[in-house]
Amino acid sequence: MASKCPKCDKTVYFAEKVSSLGKDWHKFCLKCERCNKTLTPGGHAEHDGKPFCHKPCYATLFGPKGVNIGGAGSYIYEKPQTEAPQVTGPIEVPVVRTEERKTSGPPKGPSKASSVTTFTGEPNMCPRCNKRVYFAEKVTSLGKDWHRPCLRCERCSKTLTPGGHAEHDGQPYCHKPCYGILFGPKGVNTGAVGSYIYDKDPEGTVQP
């Protein structure tokens, strides 16, 4: 059964039929609702089920601020090349970042070189004689480098071995008798804050 044209409400036969907006129209009834310009199926805008030409009628009636499209129920069609600038934006960002990475790379080289020069700098100074300590004559104790003959008891001047002596206020002392006499309470070999803890001599227990 033939349908009726929504424009003239008359029967639409196959030979004169065009379909648009989900309806069958007479070919010459498919016109712009405002200017009566004959439209082509799918080549027009729509509002509330009625056809309108894209320009100027639909834009004038329903388009916000002169834009060609807009309003509820309108067909979506191509915009006049507004999205082209968005493509160029992201491309420029990686170029800047790569340049920043290149510039930030070189400064790290000299920092490593300077740290090496500190290790190969001048020898440390002996805390006893305040002279340079070279590798061949160096012994390390109390976190410092000493000349081997300079590592001796602060009281009796006995030559000491690294790690085999007591300490008080950063100065080396022999365990017995000097440290015990100076800082040990009641004749005990060790004592006082800052001293090393070491084993007592078995002979000390025999003596009264």
UniProtKB/Swiss-Prot annotation:
Any one Gene Ontology BP term: positive regulation of cell population proliferation
A molecular-function term among this protein's GO annotations: metal ion binding
Residues in coiled coil: none
Presence of the UniProt keyword Magnesium in the record: no
Sequence positions bearing Phosphoserine: S104
Domain (LIM zinc-binding): residue spans on this chain: 5-57, 126-178
GO CC list: cell cortex
InterPro entries (alphabetical): Znf_LIM (IPR001781)
Keywords of this entry: Acetylation, LIM domain, Metal-binding, Phosphoprotein, Repeat, Zinc
Pfam family, one: LIM
Residues annotated with N6-acetyllysine modification: K23, K138, K144
Assembly notes: Interacts with TGFB1I1.
Protein name: Cysteine-rich protein 2
The species this protein was found in: Mus musculus (Mouse)
Phylogenetic placement of the source organism: Eukaryota, Metazoa, Chordata, Craniata, Vertebrata
